[in-house]
Amino acid sequence: MQGYVLDINVARDEDLWVGVLTSSKMARLYRFYGARHSVIQIGHKIDFEEEQEGAIPRLRRVMHLGFVWERDNHRRYWWQQYLRLLYRHLRDVEEMEGFYYALLDQASRRLERQDAKRAILESHAALLEYEGRSHGLERCFLCEGKLGEEVALARGFIGAHPECVYGRGIEKARIEWFLREKNSTHLSDLEVEELWKILLQGV
């Protein structure tokens, strides 16, 4: 079985509870500490076995399926940031469709050749559409007034007047195109940084 490590918590001594997103579920597995065990980090794609002993499912025979870009500390850090956010979003879900696993597979391939923040933001736009949260930018979610040519964005990339959320305005047409096409090539680095700050508020 393969999956992405989204969460790690110390149980006792050096044993761990590990949250692994697979193509069909969010597995929460117990890993006993062992000197010969490979290191597990959030963001790793792993091949593993799930072993059921009593009431506690165990994580066994773990192999890290590494990516070349993981050698880049910045890329790895941003990837880990997003996966932590994704875990908070999915932690109460047990069984799920393969969309989320496929999304991370696609994003991890993009990270080989694309700016990390742009790759992750484009994947996040696809997630919003899949979950039915890719709202239009016609009205401010706070005052419900019609939005103009510049909009500010809140968590989940929902639109608002800049003055309503005390946020930076971004050209609405550019954001609409980004959300529709899941493509950030037309966005400036400053706009990407603004979207990244919003993403860090939560999935």
Identify the function of each model-found stretch.
Residues 1-14, 23-203:
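Non-catalytic alpha-helical scaffolds and adjoining flexible linkers that form interface surfaces
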Residues 18-20:
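SH3/SH3-like beta-barrel fold
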